[in-house]
């Protein structure tokens, strides 16, 4: 499981700015998918081959109920589930009573805590940080999050005990195809897991959220290894407090990052709700292959089934490549048909093609439909190669390719999808502009050679005039 780092601190100390610096997520990564909104309170991050999940827990200490109520009702749940805590303070504002109260609470938890003093730009750092030593959390790490200063050094200190990511091929040998079953509470995730396994391996009750944590279940089917990941339920706001919901989502993110294929389970009777779309958004951001299972399809009237199908077509139109199955996990209807779609999604997500073949397809595509012009000059796409798997990433090099509009990018994606029959996975296309190797290089010609060239040019011009006469 990916480690979780929680950003803690009172309001306006710069946690969100620091979050953006760590995750590089000022713009939503799924912005290309129309109608999909994201709460940017949590995100994936990688630093020096170390992957982790970071959470901005919101401001502490200024709520109406006071620090104790806030810690009891919201933050304690979040902090208890974090592996590392970054306690952010404001170097400009200095040490406040609420900082001291938060520090007292944090010290009782036995967690690894790093004190980070933000906004050190524009102040005398040594003088400003002296008072923070009384918090008893060691030497403050200095950052200026708005400028990105000190963030890399902070990450090196914070992540020093976090191991580097495993070799994916070695991990795959042990676990086989890793399949994450995700969805809101009570949509039938655990029932589906039990049906896929053929036995009651996971306790499943009618109470939402009965699966308390992600459960990893290895099994074999028809000679093939699998690991099923049953995730804790993602709750609706209003049913439980915000922090619990946020960390339920973090558990889902952890499972997604560890999976090859994600099965998103939706309740046909409740219909498609925003949280279902958010879950799909998380899977897209993680770049994971995906299969949609519309569960509880049994005992629905013909009218309700028709309305559900229309809703599915309308709400899921931004992922036309995802296979959608109508199932009943309880009775097993349609469950067996999930496996072919899961295998196809897995194979598509792990596409491997030689640069020569990719470049040939690229050339055929650009010959058939030329790239547009930018500032009077046509975009030139020269060659392509694979940049990674899960999701399949195609890197295209050329001149001005970084100016490629979204509609032409989609055209290229559709071409690659059609040629390689890619189903059930997002396809990532990256553009890299070829650099001029001589750009910015000073001329090595000395003054004597330059003068000789000027004389030749003058001589040529005189000869040209004489010839014209």
Swiss-Prot record:
One Pfam family linked to the record: KH_dom-like
Binding site residues for GTP 1: 9-16, 56-60, 118-121
A single GO molecular function term of this UniProt record: ribosome binding
Signal peptide range in chain numbering: none
Binding site for GTP 2: 183-190, 230-234, 295-298
InterPro entries in the record: G_ENGA, GTP-bd, GTPase_Der, KH_dom-like, KH_dom-like_a/b, P-loop_NTPase, Small_GTP-bd
Keywords from the UniProt entry: GTP-binding, Nucleotide-binding, Repeat, Ribosome biogenesis
Stretches assigned to the KH-like domain: 351-435
A GO biological-process term: ribosome biogenesis
Domain EngA-type G: 3-166, 177-350
Gene3D superfamilies reported in the protein's UniProt record: 3.30.300.20, P-loop containing nucleotide triphosphate hydrolases
SUPFAM superfamilies according to UniProt: P-loop containing nucleoside triphosphate hydrolases
Quaternary assembly: Associates with the 50S ribosomal subunit.
Family according to the record: Belongs to the TRAFAC class TrmE-Era-EngA-EngB-Septin-like GTPase superfamily. EngA (Der) GTPase family.
HAMAP family: GTPase_Der
Function per UniProt: GTPase that plays an essential role in the late steps of ribosome biogenesis.
NCBIfam families reported in the protein's UniProt record: GTPase_EngA, small_GTP
Protein name: GTPase Der
């Amino acid at each position: 499981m990916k480690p979780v780092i929680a950003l803690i601190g009172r309001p306006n100390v710069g946690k969100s700015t620091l979050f953006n610096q760590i995750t590089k997520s000022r713009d939503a990564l799924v912005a290309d998918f129309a109608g999909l909104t994201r709460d940017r309170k949590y995100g994936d991050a990688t630093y020096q081959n170390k992957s982790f999940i970071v959470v901005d827990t919101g401001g502490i200490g200024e709520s109406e109920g006071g620090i104790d109520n806030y810690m009891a009702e919201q933050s304690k749940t979040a902090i208890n589930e974090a592996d590392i805590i970054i306690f952010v303070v404001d170097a400009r504002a200095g040490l406040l009573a609420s900082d001291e109260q938060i520090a007292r609470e944090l010290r009782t938890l036995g967690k690894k805590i790093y004190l980070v003093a933000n906004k050190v730009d524009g102040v005398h750092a040594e003088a400003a940080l002296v008072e923070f030593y009384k918090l008893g959390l060691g030497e403050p790490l200095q950052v200026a999050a708005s400028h990105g200063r000190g963030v890399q050094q902070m990450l090196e200190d914070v992540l020093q005990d976090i191991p580097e990511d495993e070799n994916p091929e070695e991990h795959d040998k042990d676990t086989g195809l890793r399949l994450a079953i995700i969805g809101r509470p009570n949509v039938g995730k655990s029932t589906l897991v039990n049906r896929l396994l053929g036995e009651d391996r996971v306790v499943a009750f009618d109470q939402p959220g009965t699966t308390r944590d992600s459960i990893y279940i290895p099994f074999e089917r028809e000679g093939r290894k699998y690991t099923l990941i049953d995730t804790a339920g993602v709750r609706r706001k209003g049913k439980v407090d915000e922090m619990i919901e946020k960390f339920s989502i973090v558990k889902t993110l952890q499972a997604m990052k560890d999976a090859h294929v994600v099965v998103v389970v939706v309740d046909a009777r409740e219909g498609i709700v925003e949280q279902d779309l958010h879950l799909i958004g998380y899977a897209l951001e993680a770049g994971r292959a995906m299969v949609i299972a519309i569960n509880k399809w049994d005992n629905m009237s013909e009218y309700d089934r028709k309305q559900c199908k229309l809703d599915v077509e309308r709400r899921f139109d931004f992922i036309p490549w995802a296979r959608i199955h109508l199932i009943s996990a309880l009775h097993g209807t349609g469950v067996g048909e999930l496996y072919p779609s899961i295998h196809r999604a897995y194979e598509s997500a792990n596409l491997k093609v030689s640069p020569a073949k990719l470049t040939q397809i690229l050339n055929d595509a650009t010959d058939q439909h030329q790239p547009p012009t930018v500032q009077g000059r046509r975009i030139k796409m020269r060659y392509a190669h694979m940049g990674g798997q899960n999701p399949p990433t195609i890197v295209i090099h050329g001149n001005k390719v970084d100016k490629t509009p979204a509609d032409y990018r989609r055209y290229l994606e559709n071409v690659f999808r059609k040629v390689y029959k890619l189903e059930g996975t997002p396809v990532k296309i990256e553009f890299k502009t070829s650099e001029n190797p001589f750009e910015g290089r000073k001329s090595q010609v000395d003054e004597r050679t330059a003068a000789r060239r000027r004389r030749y040019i003058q001589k040529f011009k005189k000869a040209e005039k004489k010839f014209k006469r």
